[in-house]
Amino acid sequence: MKKIIILCFLFYACGTGDRSTMNSVHLKTDATTDSIEHVVKEMLLAISTNDLAKAKYHVLEEGRVFRVRNDGMSFRSNSEFFKQTGDQTTDYFERMWDPIIMYRGDLAVAWTTYDFHLNGKFSHCGAESFTLTRVDGRWMVMDWAYTANEPENCNSPLGPIVN
């Protein structure tokens, strides 16, 4: 619960406050936003290719994954997520587009829309947010949250999967 409150505060703090100090929040693309986006994409690609060692490299073990659906919210630790993902033979594939990345110092947020496929078939889409921090000079995902909408509410600009 404490992490949820902190995460909500961070999102609130990024959107409010004295605008004269907000010029240090970066919304345009630069080397830092590119490196943050790269970490998120690498993590998702590693999950999609079942390379859990590579995925774990980009994620803090102590963090959490939150799923928000019409029937409520659930969460689990990053460790639990990787254990469950590694124990399955399901083929995952996720694509993201139009990420919005903000950072200040060693804290960053990446917000994106995505679609998700299981065993080569479209499953769902939604919005996904990642909270990252810089640890020993490299960006790592602390927590991430996503909505999981039913297929009829999805409009991916990426078209069908090309194998």
Model-inferred region functions:
Residues K3-Y12:
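Sec-dependent N-terminal signal peptides
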Residues C14-T49, A53, Y57, I161-V162:
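Short, low-complexity N-terminal intrinsically disordered segments enriched in polar/charged residues
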Residues H38, K56-E94:
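Short solvent-exposed beta->alpha transition segments
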Residues V59, R69-D71, T112-F116, E128, ...:
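A mature extracytoplasmic/lumenal domain signature
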Residues R76-S123:
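Surface-exposed, charged secondary-structure patches
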